[in-house]
Design a protein with these regions (language model features):
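His/Met- and acidic-residue-enriched segments that coordinate or traffic transition-metal cofactors
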Residues: 10-11, 34
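Short, positively charged and aromatic/hydrophobic N-terminal segments
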Residues: 4-8
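Active-site-proximal alpha-helical scaffolds that flank and shape metal-associated catalytic sites
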Residues: 78-183, 213, 217
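Acidic, carboxylate-rich catalytic segments that either coordinate divalent cations
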Residues: 206-231
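Long amphipathic all-alpha helical oligomerization modules
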Residues: 178-212
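Short alpha-helical hairpin
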Residues: 18-43, 61, 189-198
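Alpha-helical bundle segments that constitute or directly flank the non-heme di-iron/ferroxidase center
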Residues: 22-27, 41-71, 91, 140-150, ...
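Secondary-structure edge/capping motif, primarily at the C-terminal ends of alpha-helices
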Residues: 68-72, 130-133, 156-160, 195, ...
Length: 231
């Protein structure tokens, strides 16, 4: 069971931001796209569109971590950013390409497509947060994706409606509910907390909350983008 990783973090800045977001966070976690992945009813067309856009998304997120390295003020933060970028480029994207091939998508299918407007809007918002702000702003913008997928994966894996044998998205759920990804999310929460303690404070909370909420809304739009392919 992977939930233990988050037990001692409930008072951290991440959970304060999440819990003060109103219905936005639950709308993200409970979007029809997510629910349809959980019960196996999502159309193949919708999921393939998501996979293509997620490939393009990952490329831009690796750039966000390159920016994080530039914005870092300590070697520890710089190493963390470089490790995250390397993980996306050398590991996560390669895994994604391999997973996409199981859905009949080639590398040409992935790289030959244009970014959806939702993909561009989300990724450029994150990068812009890093350009105009500091590392805390950038990590806050990244948090809904990194940590949100861990929470979604965990909830779907624990759902009584998950058909372990017949759900075609079972391996996707296992990837984000697995201990390895859960630890990545926990590390992101810890880093955000460390940055907040160094650079945060009450005067920054409202601006961080605004960044967090907007990034979460853009996550919802990313789901919605793929969900519309059902129609």
């Amino acid at each position: 069971h992977t939930g233990y990783i988050f037990v001692n973090m409930k008072n951290s800045i991440f959970f304060c931001l999440r819990d003060s977001s109103g219905t936005i966070w639950e709308d993200y976690l409970q979007h029809p796209f997510v629910q349809s992945v959980g019960n196996g009813s999502l159309s193949e067309n919708s999921f393939k569109y998501y996979l293509i856009q997620d490939y393009l998304f990952l490329i831009q997120f690796s750039r966000a971590y390159a920016l994080a390295a530039y914005k870092s003020e300590t070697l520890e933060d710089m190493r963390s950013a470089v490790a995250a970028m390397s993980n996306i480029i050398d590991f996560e994207i390669q895994l994604h390409i391999k997973y996409c091939s199981s859905w009949g998508l080639t590398l040409d299918d992935l790289s030959g497509k244009c970014e959806d407007i939702a993909t561009t809007a989300y990724t450029r918002f994150v990068i812009e947060c890093g350009h105009r702000g500091d590392l805390l702003d950038l990590m806050t913008a990244l948090a809904p994706c990194v940590v949100g997928y861990a929470e979604i994966g965990r909830k779907l894996a624990e759902s009584p409606t998950l058909d372990q044998k017949l759900n075609p998205f079972k391996s996707w759920i296992e990837m984000y509910s697995g201990e390895e990804y859960q630890k990545i999310a926990a590390s992101a929460i810890h880093q955000l907390q460390t940055l907040f303690e160094k650079r945060g404070g009450p005067n920054r909370y409202n601006s961080l909350s605004s960044i967090f909420n907007q990034a979460t809304r853009l996550e919802i739009e990313f789901w919605e983008m793929a969900w519309k392919q059902q129609e």
